[in-house]
């Protein structure tokens, strides 16, 4: 099985929690190709120097002292939308010349395809905004839902138990459909089990 793994470049958390997934598939003798940009992709390249990597369009978005201002949030949403479109278009160009059996995107909104089974990793099924930005929260949740519903599955790196979990209402704040698979916390310091609560990390590969 040939797998493309693409984490968001927003801090190193998205890339670092992809490390145990990459190790799992390599142990299964699958072919893994990395994709991303910036420090996030650099971390994966340093961790897996033997793997090929594809550079994706960069998302230039960072927190500032004005990050809780409405103007910043509106601009950030616009940048995210543009980045998602650019990511998706670039990915489709890659897929036109190279085939994959599975795409795993850690919060990289545009890394999915109708022609390849795609998985989205997030612990924020229900985004929570600062108080002064609460007016935008319904829109933020609707936008995020629109994005992850384009994927075949959503992997939530947390426990399914509503009384025993790490991300609280971010991942347990409402109803969700069959796409959600709570796979347990991911850490680069821990080796994955052969199965993760019914998710795809097992010996039976996805079929396209």
Task: Give the ranges of each region predicted by the language model.
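A nucleotide-sugar donor-handling region in carbohydrate enzymes
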Residues: 130-196, 205-208
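Conserved nucleotide-sugar donor-binding subdomain of glycosyltransferases
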Residues: 68-110
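Conserved nucleotide-sugar phosphate-binding/catalytic loop shared by glycosyltransferases and other
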Residues: 7-9, 28, 32-78
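Extreme N-terminal starter segment of soluble prokaryotic enzymes
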Residues: 1-3
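Short, well-ordered beta-strand core segments
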Residues: 103, 118, 154-155
